[in-house]
Amino acid sequence: YERLIVNLRQLDCTTFVENVTALSVCARENYSSFSDYCRILKKLRYWGGEIKNYTSRLHYFSWWGLDNQKKGFITEVSCGDSLFSATQVLSVDYMTNNSHLYKHLSSNAFYRDSIRNYENLYNGLKFSFLPKNRLKNSKDIISKIRSGDIIAIVTNKKGLDISHVGIAIWIKGKLHLMHASSLKKKVIIDDLTLYDYSMKQKSNLGIRVFRIVGF
């Protein structure tokens, strides 16, 4: 049984970004009730905004990006920009190849097959991203990336597309990441610039950037 869980006390990187997006949409539309917020969060979190079962959730962030562009919540900033010169070919299968790590998949062949069908359906899609070495020169990117944009870190880890997500924030002319840190166990604005943060992580290839519509 799948239901919408709202928990603002315990956030991972994805639920942090989802909640920021939901609150932003509510602010833009002048929605002020908790039920409005829950309705928007549900729309963001699930394929087509509908909860049927565990497989209704947008489990990989590339899926989240695609479906929420379709629903009109976000746009991808990188489209057609020469700075975003690298290409990621989607090839996700981490969940189905490691189904023992997911309690809903380890005991349910129908769910496993359903997730695998989604994986196969979207694998092969190509996405432009900004290579991490291009983050070094703030002058190049300051006109492209705004504070409040969603940053998705592209990874070369097998079976995954995005390793971490957060919110862009400019501080003294340098781009930083606001994110739910698994290391610090809380939401932080990282002391490191996004360039330095990315260079420390060998598996990080670069970033995709999404903007909440209306901001």
Name what the model sees in each region:
Residues F129-I141:
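Short alpha-helix capping/helix-loop boundary micro-motifs
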